[in-house]
Design a protein with these regions (language model features):
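Glycine-/small-residue-rich active-site loops that bind phosphorylated ligands and cofactors
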Residues: 8, 31, 57, 272-273
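Short glycine-enriched loop/turn motifs at secondary-structure junctions
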Residues: 106-110, 199-202
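Conserved PLP-anchoring active-site segment centered on the Schiff-base-forming lysine
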Residues: 1-43, 221
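Histidine-centered beta-alpha loop that forms part of the nucleotide-sugar donor binding/catalytic region
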Residues: 7, 21, 28, 54, ...
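Active-site phosphate-binding strand-loop segment of PLP-dependent enzymes
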Residues: 30-108, 114-116, 121, 266
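PLP-dependent aminotransferase class I/II
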Residues: 37, 49-53, 62-64, 71, ...
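Hydrophobic/aromatic ligand-binding patch that stacks against planar heteroaromatic rings
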Residues: 14-16, 68, 105, 155
Length: 290
């Protein structure tokens, strides 16, 4: 068993199932992060790892989850696909997974990613499993029973080596846009809940919560005005149509998480967004709630 949050992209639970393990879904709070207490509540003698996700760019609770898991001698693997740039993360986990999908804060031209670790042994194993199980420096001599061909190709690596030089500026741009949302939407606190302002956030996305069940009507209103809001990962993991989801008989244990998710919307935020474009989004929200 591997403990995962119930609101992540399907790749999180798929990675667990790909190695023959079972994902155990954990509740979230309004930060959209797995609650640390869920590790103690859900862990059993079968628990082999905890896999928290830094969803939408927020990495709240990772250090607390790591402390709890370490006491129980359970490894922590952090899905930081949306959280590139938080350097302290690596000290709070055994493995850290990154994505360089073109839609991420730093993206290649296609599909690529990386695994980070402070453990030389885990690094050695990762390199072997990523290249057919071959021993390092000994092509066609297998050191593992199995492996994948999942090395980053040269084109993606070359692209990322250039984009890294622009990452800090892009990260500052995202922080500026997030700060402007917080400042210029603060007067709507009776209508929307803004994400917590923290330096432990890369602002991959900007999620808000609607206080009065107006998500669908705001979504439609904004679209009429030419502003595209979104709901990323609209179906929670335990609500799918696959056998793993339909096997969850105690849906009431997720009622609080479902309530939070049902109020979620994402505002536009990306590296190339101009302040004028952001002002239009802010104006649309004020027009709706006036």
């Amino acid at each position: 068993e591997v403990i995962v949050p119930l609101n992540s992209f399907a790749a999180t639970e798929n990675a667990v199932m790909a190695v023959g393990a079972v994902p155990v879904f954990a509740n979230i709070d309004s930060s959209f992060n797995m609650l640390p207490d869920e590790v103690d509540r859900l862990r059993t003698s079968k628990t082999k790892a905890v896999l928290p996700v830094c969803l939408y760019g927020s990495c709240m609770y990772i250090d607390a989850i790591h402390r709890i898991a370490r006491k129980a001698d359970i490894p922590v693997i952090v899905d930081a696909a949306q959280c590139f740039g938080i350097r302290s993360l690596i000290s709070h986990c055994d493995l850290l997974a990154l994505s360089f999908n073109p839609f991420k804060n730093i993206g290649s031209l296609g599909k690529s990613g990386a695994v980070l670790t402070l453990s030389p042994e885990l690094a050695r194993l990762a390199r072997q499993y990523s290249y057919h199980g071959f021993a390092e420096g000994k092509k066609n001599i297998k050191a593992q029973n199995w492996g994948l061909n999942s090395r980053m190709d040269n084109l993606q690596a070359a692209t990322l080596s250039v984009k890294l030089h622009h990452f800090e500026n892009n990260a500052k741009k995202r922080c500026l846009l997030a700060a402007r949302y917080h400042l210029l939407l603060s007067d709507l606190s009776h209508n929307i809940i803004l994400p917590t302002e923290t330096h432990q956030n890369t602002w991959h996305l900007f999620p808000i919560l609607l206080c009065k069940g107006e998500r669908d009507s705001l979504f439609a209103f904004a679209r009429e005005k030419g502003v595209e809001l979104d709901i990323y990962y609209p179906v929670l993991s335990h609500c799918g149509e696959h056998p793993l989801a339909t096997g969850y008989s105690r849906r009431e244990q997720f009622s609080d998480s479902e309530k939070i998710h049902s109020a979620l919307l994402h505002l536009p935020l990306h590296n190339h967004m101009s302040l004028q474009e952001q002002n239009i989004v802010i104006e649309v929200l004020h027009d709706y709630f006036k």
